[in-house]
């Protein structure tokens, strides 16, 4: 009974302990789930009590084992830390006691190094540092003797090197001082210094000035050429006033001027041939037209300076005077010395000028006129060219002109007759203008060639114009009035001014804007014919009458150019050759 009771009590206690352990495990697992989110998948209620007891016992043993192991490791580490300092001291004390010879050798090596550094003080015997040892002292006594025996030549060598270095440094310093004194002219030691006299200094200064002046002139030669080309128009009879002063740079200027004068004829030829690359209107380049118009509007009543044709190709830069343009170099002595009031080119500038609306057009109006059609009222009445003939009561007709073809033929026949006389007059004017300059045989030959080429070109022009008129008259009568009158105005210009036709017909007029008018050129031909009529009045009066008729009938050109103004490439080449020969 007693034995059973002991076992029963033990079983009861085990069950109670297992129940507590189950509760604790369940609480712990719930804590892990709720707080840490760990689900181990254990359910302590399913397991029997003895399993729980065995597991808890095993865990307890593991914990005890881990705690004991950690404690033992901590204790071992503490013991090692406590025992390590005395061991190091014992080792440090045992090393010198074990090897005294090594210490002596180290000391000897150190002493030798110090002796090498301090060789100047080696006359005295060095004493060994540290403790005195018999072996060490013997070695120390032996080494100084050998060192003292070897040191004197080395010391001498170093002293010599130091002396050489000092000498070199002194010589370098002297050279630097000498170079600074003599302004870059190095003077060697021991060399004789040559003194320069005042006369030589003056000559050297003159040479330096000449060099600087020549350098500046060489750099400004293009500017000098430009100024000379501008001012040569005033120097038709006078010489260039540069050589008045005998300065050092004047020789270059005189040479430049002489070269320029000698090559003046060539330059005019180059300029005139260069016009073949530009389209021409009134003898000038088309690219220059807008510039001319804009500047002429702002100029007011400005005068044309009388310039001989030899100075053609150079333009003045003064805004108050107008000289002959490069494009007008080969127009056979046009009268450029007339005032604006007599010129009648630009309306609104001169008081008696003919009111032409095109003369005051600006670049903007050129562009606008391409898109806007012309109005007949602008070219009729007081706004048109009828002011040249105050008795005319011409107005723009609404139907085709019936008698206009006959007038054209008659005017062409009349205008073709006095061509040689007009040519003679223009050639005489050109000879007068060129007579002012000093000319040679070469220029006279050029004049003769010009006359021959121009006579040939005028004859060719008249024949070609007659053919073109015969071909185009039936076509023009059926076309609109502006086209007919534009072709006629071009033909009258070509018959009255053959040299101007050379300039105009030397290039195709394809790229000209369609809205450009030929009215200024018509008026120029009128002014030239006025001049020629004043010189040869009985011959050229008929041409003036025909031109007045053409001016009354002149109309702004339409958008499409008439085909009468075109020429074949062979004719253009012939005219170019004639111009080159001139």
From Swiss-Prot:
Chain residue ranges for the region called Lung-homing for mammary tumors: 381-443
Record GO biological process: lipopolysaccharide-mediated signaling pathway; negative regulation of apoptotic process; negative regulation of transcription by RNA polymerase II; positive regulation of angiogenesis; positive regulation of autophagy; positive regulation of canonical NF-kappaB signal transduction; positive regulation of NF-kappaB transcription factor activity; positive regulation of phosphatidylinositol 3-kinase/protein kinase B signal transduction
Modified residues (Phosphoserine): 180, 216, 251, 298, 306, 308, 311, 323, 339, 344, 369, 415, 426, 457, 478, 494, 496, 568
Region (Interaction with BCCIP): 72-169
Cellular component, GO annotation: apical plasma membrane; bicellular tight junction; cytoplasm; endoplasmic reticulum; endoplasmic reticulum membrane; fibrillar center; intercellular canaliculus; nuclear body
UniProt biased composition (Polar residues): 320-333, 354-372, 383-394, 504-520, 549-568
Ranges for region Activation of NF-kappa-B: 1-71
Pfam families noted in UniProt: LYRIC
UniProt subcellular location: Endoplasmic reticulum membrane; Nucleus membrane; Cell junction, Tight junction; Nucleus, Nucleolus
Biased composition (Basic residues): 160-169, 198-208, 441-451, 571-582
GO MF, any single term: transcription coregulator activity
Renumbered residue ranges of the record's region Disordered: 78-222, 280-582
Membrane topology classification: Single-pass membrane protein
Ranges for region Interaction with RELA: 101-205
Role played: Down-regulates SLC1A2/EAAT2 promoter activity when expressed ectopically. Activates the nuclear factor kappa-B (NF-kappa-B) transcription factor. Promotes anchorage-independent growth of immortalized melanocytes and astrocytes which is a key component in tumor cell expansion. Promotes lung metastasis and also has an effect on bone and brain metastasis, possibly by enhancing the seeding of tumor cells to the target organ endothelium. Induces chemoresistance.
Name of the protein this chain belongs to: Protein LYRIC
């Amino acid at each position: 009974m007693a034995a059973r009771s002991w076992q029963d009590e033990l079983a009861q206690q085990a069950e109670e302990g297992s129940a507590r352990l189950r509760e604790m495990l369940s609480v712990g697992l719930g804590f892990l789930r709720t707080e840490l989110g760990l689900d181990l998948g254990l359910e302590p209620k399913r397991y029997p009590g003895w399993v729980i007891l065995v597991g808890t016992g095993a865990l307890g043993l593991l914990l005890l084992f881990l705690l004991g192991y950690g404690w033992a490791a901590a204790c071992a580490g503490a013991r090692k830390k406590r025992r390590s300092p005395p061991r190091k001291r014992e080792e440090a004390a045992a090393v010198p006691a074990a090897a005294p010879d090594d210490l002596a050798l180290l000391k000897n090596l150190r002493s030798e190094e110090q002796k090498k550094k301090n060789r100047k003080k080696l006359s005295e015997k060095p004493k060994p540092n540290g403790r005195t040892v018999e072996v060490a002292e013997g070695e120390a006594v032996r080494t100084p003797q050998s060192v003292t025996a070897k040191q004197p030549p080395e010391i001498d060598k170093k002293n010599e090197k130091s002396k050489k270095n000092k000498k070199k440094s002194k010589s370098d310093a002297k050279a630097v001082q000498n170079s600074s004194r003599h302004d870059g002219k190095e003077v060697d030691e021991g060399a004789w210094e040559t003194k320069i006299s005042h006369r030589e200094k003056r000559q050297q200064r003159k040479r330096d000035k000449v060099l600087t002046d020549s350098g500046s002139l060489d750099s400004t030669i293009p500017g000098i050429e430009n100024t000379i080309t501008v001012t040569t128009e005033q120097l038709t009879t006078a010489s260039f006033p540069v050589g008045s002063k005998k300065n050092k740079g004047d020789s270059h200027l005189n040479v430049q001027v002489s070269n320029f004068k000698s090559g003046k004829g060539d330059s005019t030829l180059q300029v005139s041939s260069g016009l073949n690359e530009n389209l021409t209107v009134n003898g000038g380049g088309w690219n220059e037209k807008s510039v001319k118009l804009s500047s002429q509007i702002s100029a007011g009543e400005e005068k044309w300076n009388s310039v001989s044709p030899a100075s053609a190709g150079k333009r003045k830069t003064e805004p108050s005077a107008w000289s002959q343009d490069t494009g007008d170099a080969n127009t056979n002595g046009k009268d450029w010395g007339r005032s604006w009031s007599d010129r009648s080119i630009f309306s609104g500038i001169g008081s008696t000028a003919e009111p032409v609306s095109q003369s005051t057009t600006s670049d903007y109006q050129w562009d606008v006129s391409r898109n806007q059609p012309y109005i007949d009222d602008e070219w009729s009445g007081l706004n048109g060219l009828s002011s040249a003939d105050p008795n005319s009561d011409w107005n723009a007709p609404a139907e085709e002109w019936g008698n206009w073809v006959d007038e054209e033929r008659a005017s062409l026949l009349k205008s073709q007759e006095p061509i040689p006389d007009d040519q003679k007059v223009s050639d005489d004017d050109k000879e007068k203008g060129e007579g002012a300059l000093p000319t040679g045989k070469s220029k006279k030959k050029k004049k003769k060639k010009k006359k021959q080429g121009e006579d040939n070109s005028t004859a060719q022009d008249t024949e070609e114009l007659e053919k073109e008129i015969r071909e185009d008259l039936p076509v023009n009568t059926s076309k609109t009035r502006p086209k007919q009158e534009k072709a006629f105005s071009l033909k009258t210009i070509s018959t009255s001014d053959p040299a101007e036709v050379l300039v105009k017909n030397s290039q195709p007029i394809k790229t000209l804007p369609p809205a450009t008018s030929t009215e200024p050129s018509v008026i120029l031909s009128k002014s030239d014919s006025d001049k020629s009529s004043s010189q040869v009045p009985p011959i050229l009066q008929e041409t003036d009458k025909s031109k007045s008729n053409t001016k009354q009938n002149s109309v702004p050109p339409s958008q499409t150019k008439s085909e009468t103004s075109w020429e074949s490439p062979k004719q253009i080449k012939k005219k170019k050759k004639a111009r080159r020969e001139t």
